Amino acid sequence: MNIGRKIHWVFFLGGIADILILDVVTKVLVVRGIIGEFTFIKGFFYITTFRKNDGIAFGIDLPMWLQIVGSLAILLLLLKIGFEYFFGRQQVSLFEHWLFGAVIGGGLGNLIDRVLHGYVVDFIVLRPFPVFNIADIGITVGLVVLFGTMWLSSRETKT
């Protein structure tokens, strides 16, 4: 494996580690009450006591076994597609590898919660969205920015 390929792996694994560590640490701090309620913008953006989210995205309720199997299937599918795309092309930036890792790290963070607790710990409120956590930020922001960078780079190659 050449040095260029190794750097891409470092960024990918770094994205996983960054989001996963932040997610696990913040959830532990919130659950233990070390981080209490904190307001950034009153009634709009704040940290709350933790909420047990026993559903999936946007509170959709499914049996726990289906949530775990579904989460694993989605993670494996993302890994398969991601590896084919990111590690099979020459023109993928380090930032894109980090973003891909952030998405996977977020998925792992929520999967760990489901397996260990039977629910996901949520604690960040940003109205009008449902309560969420760091893993959700890694997944959502990671995907949006990743698709944006992919779209921009595809436009650049066409011109």
Predicted regions and their residues:
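Alpha-helical transmembrane bundles and membrane-interface segments of multipass inner-membrane proteins
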Residues: 1-159
